[in-house]
Amino acid sequence: MGKCSISQANLGETGFSYTLSLINGKYKMTILYTLMEFGVVRFNEMKKYIGEISYKTLSVTLKELESDQLVHREEYPQIPPKVEYSLTERGKSLIPILDMMCEWGEKHRLPSRRTQKKVDIWDNTE
């Protein structure tokens, strides 16, 4: 497994830093993961899948991902307008990273406060 060398370059010039600059943002990874899971997705479907994101934030974030060539936007000239989003080949190259992050999260997930409280309620070892 290769490592980014910090000793030879400023941290801002490493592959790690570059990758983070593309995927860092409150909803970028969620959007990429949604496209990975569902393939071609329309704007309102994406909003429904993510839920808490505003229409403006979704629009801006999709434009950024499109500008970075991670997401493809296909617009169909019809009424009403139809726009679909999908991962580009470049975006698809992030799938192994997204999968690894998902696996890591499942393996190392800490119990939530709600779950912890439920466990504590039933703990009679006092």
Kindly give the residue locations of the regions a language model identified.
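Basic amphipathic alpha-helical segments that dock to polyanions
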Residues: 58, 62-65
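Generic recognition of well-ordered alpha-helical segments
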Residues: 18, 48, 60, 96-99, ...
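N-terminal helix-turn-helix DNA-binding core of bacterial DNA-binding proteins
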Residues: 10, 14-57, 84
